[in-house]
Swiss-Prot record:
<keyword id="KW-0325">Glycoprotein</keyword>
<dbReference type="InterPro" id="IPR000772">
    <property type="entry name" value="Ricin_B_lectin"/>
</dbReference>
<feature type="glycosylation site" description="N-linked (GlcNAc...) asparagine">
    <location>
        <position position="166"/>
    </location>
</feature>
<feature type="topological domain" description="Lumenal">
    <location>
        <begin position="39"/>
        <end position="630"/>
    </location>
</feature>
<dbReference type="GO" id="GO:0030246">
    <property type="term" value="F:carbohydrate binding"/>
</dbReference>
<feature type="region of interest" description="Catalytic subdomain A">
    <location>
        <begin position="186"/>
        <end position="296"/>
    </location>
</feature>
<dbReference type="GO" id="GO:0012505">
    <property type="term" value="C:endomembrane system"/>
</dbReference>
<feature type="binding site">
    <location>
        <position position="387"/>
    </location>
    <ligand>
        <name>substrate</name>
    </ligand>
</feature>
<dbReference type="InterPro" id="IPR045885">
    <property type="entry name" value="GalNAc-T"/>
</dbReference>
<keyword id="KW-0328">Glycosyltransferase</keyword>
<feature type="binding site">
    <location>
        <position position="282"/>
    </location>
    <ligand>
        <name>Mn(2+)</name>
    </ligand>
</feature>
<feature type="region of interest" description="Catalytic subdomain B">
    <location>
        <begin position="356"/>
        <end position="418"/>
    </location>
</feature>
<comment type="pathway">
    <text>Protein modification; protein glycosylation.</text>
</comment>
<keyword id="KW-0333">Golgi apparatus</keyword>
<feature type="binding site">
    <location>
        <position position="280"/>
    </location>
    <ligand>
        <name>Mn(2+)</name>
    </ligand>
</feature>
<keyword id="KW-0812">Transmembrane</keyword>
<protein>
    <recommendedName>
        <fullName>Polypeptide N-acetylgalactosaminyltransferase 5</fullName>
        <ecNumber>2.4.1.41</ecNumber>
    </recommendedName>
</protein>
Amino acid sequence: MTFSTFTRKMRGRMRSNTCRIVLLTSLVWVIFDFVLIARYSDCIGKDGWRCKRSGEYDVELPNAERLVDDNQLVDDNEINTEKSLDGESGGALIMGQGFASGGISMTYPSVVLKKWFLAPSVQEAKGKPGEMGKPVKIPADMKDLMKEKFKENQFNLLASDMISLNRSLTDVRHEGCRRKHYASKLPTTSIVIVFHNEAWTTLLRTVWSVINRSPRALLKEIILVDDASERDFLGKQLEEYVAKLPVKTFVLRTEKRSGLIRARLLGAEHVSGEVITFLDAHCECTEGWLEPLLARIVQNRRTVVCPIIDVISDETFEYITASDSTWGGFNWKLNFRWYRVPSREMARRNNDRTAPLRTPTMAGGLFSIDKDYFYEIGSYDEGMDIWGGENLEMSFRIWQCGGILEIIPCSHVGHVFRDKSPYTFPGGVAKIVLHNAARVAEVWLDEWRDFYYSMSTGARKASAGDVSDRKALRDRLKCKSFRWYLENVYPESLMPLDYYYLGEIRNAETETCLDTMGRKYNEKVGISYCHGLGGNQVFAYTKRQQIMSDDLCLDASSSNGPVNMVRCHNMGGNQEWVYDAEEKWIRHTNTGQCLQRATRDDANTPLLRPCSYGKGQQWLMESKFKWQAH
């Protein structure tokens, strides 16, 4: 073989190898491109050529979706469900420790998650009543009509009827919330709204606010549950109206008046979304309300989330933003109350006002919960009647049985708060509320049950009914004790846990007892004959040196003055008292004076006086309860 022949062969082989390399490289890039397209597109193998391009949507539909900006999407791989909900590796409340194993998975299979798009903002109809959440002004010549219509629903129905069903609202979110990133795929939700004789405009404004301000892909359906309404327009007229809505909406009806609890259970039975979102029938959802709720649940399906509940004025329908620094608690009589978030929880959140807030209890009207978890944890207590107490029962159950309850500051929903209910209840409101509270006490309060009965004389007479099924549920879920709840979830609770004495405080000379007399904040503490029935005569002398009854503490601002009942602030000062168990006197730290029995001038009011250590300044503290904290 000549050198030239050898050279030609080598060149031919090199060209052949080069072609192979080029072909293989091209094939690799084609495969890589296909993988990328399949990874980031929902169109492949689904709607194919019908998929819309960025920025395209049906302009004739006012509620059509717009594409999320790229910087507002979070890739699915960024969701780390192995960490705690705060992104921490540890903490006092870690899921799965000490609770029943098994049950639903903590996370969702990817196949059920949907890619979503931001809902467009509702544009202001300038000059129209109530736009941008502004108050409605009723003309002077319509005041009488306004007062008459107010009686129908205990809110200004005339003002509501003047406002568009699609009224605009300001974006009330914290600036940091508007920059939040959420997962690009989230679970769908079904909205369940129970109503009874609701006004047409408030009910449909609730529905339209859901439709207008929710990512359409995440909104599975809206379920309206009519709890035996008697108004004609809530019958066929409502069914025909909702049938034309751009989101699947239908009406279920109870056969007889069932109450909120059982009506919600009926609605939940028909839910087809992954998450149930319960709303009241007189709400308005704001921009970006839904995504933060679902984004939290997608991280952990055992998290139950609530929006911040803003106020819609019952007089003017003005939209008023609520504080993001309050959480849910309860008092000695198991009444739900809003209290300021303690510094402990603020520190856990690194003082980030946009971070999820762990709340001891929820108001109960508005929240989202994974559908399977709702049933796994026992849904609602079907032994409860109508309304009242179900929010505390579910709150205790969530925390004690391994779940987490949060308020999501980046989600805002307005609610029409009324001074009184326009509805009547079979047997009366008090009977129903006490029955429900008794069921809560019997199942969840453990040894604090007797304390609750001592504080609420009506509850002692109320029948809780058969609670064996609910106790069995608690055993099956291996739930924690109420003491664990107070020590770990709600150490700021007003329920007596950390105290020296709990019971009546009796004057040695007059044999009369300190008594709140049913008075309210900033009124004087009283004194009356000792009746031994608990209630207004139960006081706790705490290890913070407070003398408290429920959320009221004895407070003295000046020497020789009266002693008032002021909301406990846990900061000492005017509310700090020292009890000498041997001498039996109660000395006020700030003034150095002692608590003395009432005088003839005012036989019902104890006073502060210089300490004389006489019998009129001696007080007997005897604990009635045996389960004091160690």
